[in-house]
Amino acid sequence: MITKNPMQLKAFIKNKAAEKHISAQLVMQNYMLERLLERISLSPYKNNFILKGGFLISAIVGLDTRATMDLDTTIKGFTLTHEAIRKIFTEICAIQIADDVQLEVVGISDIRETDDYPGIRVALKANYPPISVPLTVDVTTGDMITPREVEYTFSLLFDDRTISILAYNLETVLAEKLETVLSRNIANTRPRDYYDVHILYALRGADCDKATLRRALERTTQKRGSGTILTDYSEIMKEIRESDTLRKLWEKYSREYEYAKDISFDDTCKTIQTILDAIMV
């Protein structure tokens, strides 16, 4: 999108935020992540990056239904090293688009919060002076995608056009979320995992192939060494439903995000139980 000046961009952002009932900061963040994603789609690395995580979920269900502040991807076709990732992102940031935005790599570090997959965190800045927005991209490798990644058509926030990017298929998105919910059990401090399963199944459940989802879940648990959760899922879900801590975390989450306010913790648990009962028979 071409704007006359940064103030006009801020006005567009403010109007979109009001329309979606989310903060202007979230819209700005997602717009700048979109600017990065378009550059990836135009780069020689288009077929090496596979979109996943919150940004993909937001694209599937709508920004007003799921917001995120960063970008999660997995890569294929080259070794995941600091040097390789810096080189790739420097080249991607150098791609010029008529959107007034300049991107720069600020830093590279290892991801330490999770042992699910090895990863690197890329810190960037999106600049449209005086606007400067920090961006975070998590890049992993070795992800188990079942049966394979798909080409996803991504609708842009302001322009009436789309870009194409490789992404997780729906069943793999759900499988990873289900594995996270079950394996972390009552130690999970992220209510959005429950929300994501609930909203994805509510809006896209009809598009989900149960046999593929089961295979995806089995392969994900095998990859992560958590296979026993599939035989114990009913007991695990009982513990989760009875957890006061998880219930309080959900209540805080639903107060914070407008799109979750009419969904109860019991609703999310019921959805998860329904999915598991359907695929694990």
PLM feature spans:
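Structured mid-to-C-terminal alpha-helical surface segments
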Residues: 1-49, 59-67, 71-281
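Catalytic metal-binding/acid-base residues of hydrolase active sites
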Residues: 56
